[in-house]
C-alpha cells in the first residue's frame, strides 16, 4: 500500500500525515 497507518509521532522524516484518524494517521512519502 502507498499509505501505511502509523501513530502520529511516527510521521516524521520523509513521511507526512495525509489523513487523520482516531488514533493516528495515514502516512505517505512527502
From Swiss-Prot:
UniProt modification remark: Glycosylated.
GO MF assignments: calcium ion binding; phospholipase A2 activity
Activity regulation, short description: Enzymatic activity is diminished by Cd(2+) and Hg(2+).
pH dependence, entry free text: Optimum pH is 8.5.
Subcellular location, record wording: Secreted
UniProt key word Iron: no
Complex formation: Homodimer.
Protein known as: Non-toxic phospholipase A2
Organism: Walterinnesia aegyptia
Amino acid at each position: 500500500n502507498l499509505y501505511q497507518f502509523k501513530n502520529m509521532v511516527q510521521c516524521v522524516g520523509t513521511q507526512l500525515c495525509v489523513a487523520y484518524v482516531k488514533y493516528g494517521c495515514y502516512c505517505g512519502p512527502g
